[in-house]
Swiss-Prot record:
SUPFAM superfamilies: CoA-dependent acyltransferases, Peripheral subunit-binding domain of 2-oxo acid dehydrogenase complex, Single hybrid motif. It comes from Staphylococcus aureus (strain Mu50 / ATCC 700699). This is Dihydrolipoyllysine-residue acetyltransferase component of pyruvate dehydrogenase complex. GO terms for cellular component: cytoplasm. CDD domains: lipoyl_domain. Belongs to the 2-oxoacid dehydrogenase family. Pfam families: 2-oxoacid_dh, Biotin_lipoyl, E3_binding. GO terms for molecular function: dihydrolipoyllysine-residue acetyltransferase activity; lipoic acid binding. Residues 125-162 form the Peripheral subunit-binding (PSBD) domain.
Amino acid sequence: MAFEFRLPDIGEGIHEGEIVKWFVKAGDTIEEDDVLAEVQNDKSVVEIPSPVSGTVEEVMVEEGTVAVVGDVIVKIDAPDAEDMQFKGHDDDSSSKEEPAKEEAPAEQAPVATQTEEVDENRTVKAMPSVRKYAREKGVNIKAVSGSGKNGRITKEDVDAYLNGGAPTASNESAASATSEEVAETPAAPAAVSLEGDFPETTEKIPAMRRAIAKAMVNSKHTAPHVTLMDEIDVQALWDHRKKFKEIAAEQGTKLTFLPYVVKALVSALKKYPALNTSFNEEAGEIVHKHYWNIGIAADTDRGLLVPVVKHADRKSIFQISDEINELAVKARDGKLTADEMKGATCTISNIGSAGGQWFTPVINHPEVAILGIGRIAQKPIVKDGEIVAAPVLALSLSFDHRQIDGATGQNAMNHIKRLLNNPELLLMEG
């Protein structure tokens, strides 16, 4: 009887995934842990390894098709895999009748402690990235009990093993549920007739676009947005960057205006901490965050990604510049990990890089504010009673009106303007 390999749970809260690429076909001989396919959900592509050795009998799900966790995606002739059979029909019936049991922590096997005897003959179900992670942490993966579906070991299980306890539930959003590399396979347009006066083609909505759409709709439906628009003379900022641009280049740093904006935003979040919170209406709680992680919205060929500069308050402008540039390269190359897109407390969206000016950026929920920066343009301003030309930066600040009042939002905007108008004040921030 063929081993029916079902789509495993590829992350917390993830119930389906799009098969973006198969690495095997019928008749191929495979070994345990060989990569079978790439499966995408939200913004992450996960490599799915084979839990058994054998010969591929039949690929059940075509590329570009969305499969639900538990669906049979490939059949493998693996005579020695009977003990590893997922008990497919039993699993299906139990999951349909009692779906809540699938994720109940009480049903999971306890995590082994480092003092317990290890069965070296035990078959381990874990992705290659998890095995590598365990090796890097000096953990014998055979000693770790898996909390994933069908006993699959996750990175959280490895961390829990190191801590000597059970895995803790993640409080991150489902959009950042895995720590695999980010990638995207563009959806191919469907072959249709282009005859007639109004030719059309259709394509399946890519998984990343679905995730972006879901996040945008959720944010707009959940948070009442208010957007303030302003502008500021940044001649001093322009001169400051010009002065230190060559010094930065000598250290291998490409200095842009964005790190200055990051530091100014962090200062505003500290002065007006309501902007650095989350508003949990269901729980009746406001979450105050005592760390300052700044998301940087990045436009890529695969869609909008938001890598995060963590602990931006502890980093210099040069360090922030280096990190932003590194994250931008990873975003363009599809190499961002989900961990690099987790944990933002406030986000910056730079429409100025596309030549834009003012706009109404959508809050990256569950954050409560987002700062939009437009282009720097030469404009006439009044200085010392005279009209002169100066570089002027457009700013747009959207905030969740449930948590932030208009005056608070404008005061935060004024603080950001003050710092960008005189960047030497950023040195006073420590």
